[in-house]
Amino acid sequence: MTTNRWVIHNGKFAVSEGTNWNVVQGFMVVENDKIVHIGETLPEGDESLTKVDGKGLFFLPGLINTHGHAAMSLLRGHGDDLALQVWLQEKMWPMEAKMTSEDVYWGTSLSVLEMLKGGTTAFLDMYDHMDQVAKVVEQSGVRAALARGVIGLCSEEEQLRKLEESAAFARQWNGQADGKITTVISPHAPYTCPPDYIEKLVQVAHDLNLPLHTHMSETLREVEQNVADYGLRPVAHLEKLGFFSRPSLVAHAVHLNDEEIEILAKHDVAVSHNPGSNLKLASGVARVPDLLKAGVTVSLGTDGPASNNNLDMFEEMRLAALIHKGVSGDPTAVPAGEALLLGTSYGAKSIFLNDTGALQVGMKADFIALNIEQAHFYPHTDLISHTVYSASAKDVEHVWVDGKQVVKHGECLTMDEERILRESQLAFDSLLAR
């Protein structure tokens, strides 16, 4: 294999050390898909490497979106200002029932285009027609953990079909796209999957040695219904069903008590905090400071584009840093540096990736560059703070995944933006007319 070794010079790099951040001015050397050097000086012998000028740019680990439904970009704006169950039952599920694999392909393409251009280099997706999602991931060069989301409110025959689809997809695609695709087993939620069905999906995860992902405790109504149906709150319910016997990520986790936080910490369960979606659907505000204090890994997700309604991870970091200050009355809650960890390295851990999420030697070369020669970044007092409190997806200038540039000067190099915009509009129009 030919070695591709090159260097970014004259750049500013966000380097995390534990829970702290340093801004290093100097050089970063990339060899093939890995970061091999980062520091104030260039290693001896590397003077003749191909150089990328980092002047005016701030380099960060790629952002990681740990919960979403990419194809739902086709339903953006279709059902706003509604409570979760009304939104799902009256607006989303009837439309989703009509979606074809082609719809999923174009909806996912639209979302991946938005994510890449906005600095997201890895994401977790739970949906149907996941072979189409995987094709988009493979074509675009993004990194993804993918799950065929399974709803069990159906006949036993259909439950079995969905379970087999989930397992087949997971086997077929795990490790594909040069390792950029990993797979997950994903019952949709305790309120949409009977207990015995969740147990069967947990067994599939054991059989395939894969992690698990689900929605959990998103609304107070969901928690109360779980107690009424099963005599347990969702966390204890999932623990009883063996869900946490596999590496696990739960989305939302808004309504938790102290005992539930202890259970999540005991089993090393990660939480995907979705502040934008939770606010928009009036689901509530998760106890993120308490989760972090208990040692739970917390990351950030946008949820689907129909409940956010964008995929701007800078916005999620800023919301995470702001709302917990307002709710707790503590101005030190989720400081900027911690919010950036939620969007990067904690995200990698949450979606079971151990070689991305940080600018460090030996890590995958998944990183982004922000244009900081703009009014809202000045003065350059604290670039970590500016990233969380001032930046947006529109500030992303360049993006690399696996050492390959996928966005250059704000333009995606791996996707046909004009066609995606056209086809996604046609797909929605067709969906609405069915």
Task: Write out the residue ranges for each language-model feature.
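Helical hairpin unit composed of two closely spaced alpha helices linked by a short loop
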Residues: 280-282
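Metal-coordinating catalytic core of metallo-dependent amide/deamination hydrolases
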Residues: 132-254, 259
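Divalent metal-coordination and catalytic microenvironments
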Residues: 11, 28, 33, 56, ...
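Alpha-helical scaffold segments that flank or form the walls of functional sites
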Residues: 76-142, 165-176, 424-433
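His/Asp/Glu-enriched, well-ordered alpha-helical/loop segment
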Residues: 240-247, 289-374, 388-391
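Active-site gating loops and adjacent loop-to-helix segments of metal-dependent hydrolytic enzymes
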Residues: 74-106, 113, 140-155, 160, ...
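Active-site microenvironment of metallo-dependent hydrolases
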Residues: 1-26, 31-36, 341-434
